[in-house]
């Protein structure tokens, strides 16, 4: 197996499919009202913003969103980024892969997924110009029609359409239809009816729980315990307990907060019902991420006057005189310099940001110290380049039985404006199978080692073997060794196979109690603000939507501190079904009396 390259929010489409099963629980109380799209923020600059300088520390989705909102309001913004703009969301080139005037093969930390439950990020996308698109980058979103739970051990796969008006069913051959029905029937046989009924009851308990019960009880209850997985069948555990946690948010079902998992599931139920959605439950970009989104965003921000310092590493946020007095950063040559501004927005991932907070800064706001309790884990991508397109599902696939919790999507068919072999690589690769690895601490099937214990080459071979075990196990060969051109593993992962592997791009996870350690965007330090997917916002998940919403909240806090007359950023909350409010009010009354939810039978 040829490796390419040097010595990846995540997939939530499993929840979109799961929402189809859960829709029955929500349909009785859901309304068909849809929330209006978030309005674009006003671009009029604040009279007091002229000459006010803001240093944005980090150039991922959070940092670029903050820069966007601030620049529209007349602030002089400089973004400091250590590696490349876009952060974990960016796509990248495979070094040395271009031939004959083509572009390098496209790679990424992990494939992008922008579901209809997002509102703030799509609003920003609409405000980024893209040639020929009346709605800017937002028009580059496309919606796969189906997804699949790929089963191993000779089990037929579960292939499901993604419900949305205008979606037509995939054209299935008689054999594909037989296999799809076989997968459903095999699951029905193994998943007892009473267990399905119990799970739907638990869904109803969560949907009708008041906010207080969610925040104070379900936040401290592991999902595994909430759905009583230990008392259920292996099929129940695999699909309903583990399948919609580990493969979605890189969080173990035994530890994941019920509030987080339930909130995500609830959002997808109503998205599938067409309530309060920006679009279909599953959306992806119609080009590699930088081509479709990040590069146009950078160009637009530069047109607004934003300056970028690429290759600058933030070392320490200094504190003095009751304010942030400056930021020590290393320039591309390694020389330490002190950056000064009127305001500072920390938009680094939490595991990097908290290392930069000086002792004085932490003492000024104890909230920063609580961020040390936030946990991260590995979720990283690998891409396989194929010389023949594999006959896979036309959307995301979730290898639900795989040891390393693999999710994947074959990308070329979703990039209609690109002839893959004509545009990328050496002309022989025709597609990219992009895979996210969510489990790095369990033994694989090929070497009996964890992903962290494997070398880069062993990781690639192991992932390929696990994919084949899930896809080639029912008498068909969907992935062929002869069609494998090369592979590329996220360069943010280093030291694999050594005692001390590292990952520069870990993902925030959500064990019980996480909610209460999330900080607010505004701090007690008058010129210091936080932006990132770890900041407390309405969507309780490490997502690009959370990063975007937190940046808007940070900018609003900054505008308040400046007594600015500029319009505040719109921060659109998750959809709340009006039909559920009466049940939630009743549950609030019961909760305050110390009673269970009325649907909670234990």
Predicted feature locations:
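Conserved beta-strand-loop-beta-strand element in the redox core of flavoprotein oxidoreductases
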Residues: 318-338
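Active-site-proximal substrate-binding core of FAD-dependent oxidoreductases
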Residues: 559-601
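C-terminal segments that line or cap access tunnels to active or ligand-binding sites in enzymes
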Residues: 274-285, 328, 341-343, 348-518, ...
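N-terminal secretory signal peptides and thylakoid transit peptides that target proteins
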Residues: 1-19
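Glycine-rich FAD pyrophosphate-binding loop
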Residues: 71-95
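N-terminal Rossmann-like FAD-binding beta1-loop-alpha1 element of flavoenzymes
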Residues: 52-78
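Dinucleotide-binding Rossmann-like beta1-alpha1 core, especially the glycine-rich loop
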Residues: 99-198
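Active-site/ligand-binding neighborhood in enzyme catalytic cores
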Residues: 195-323
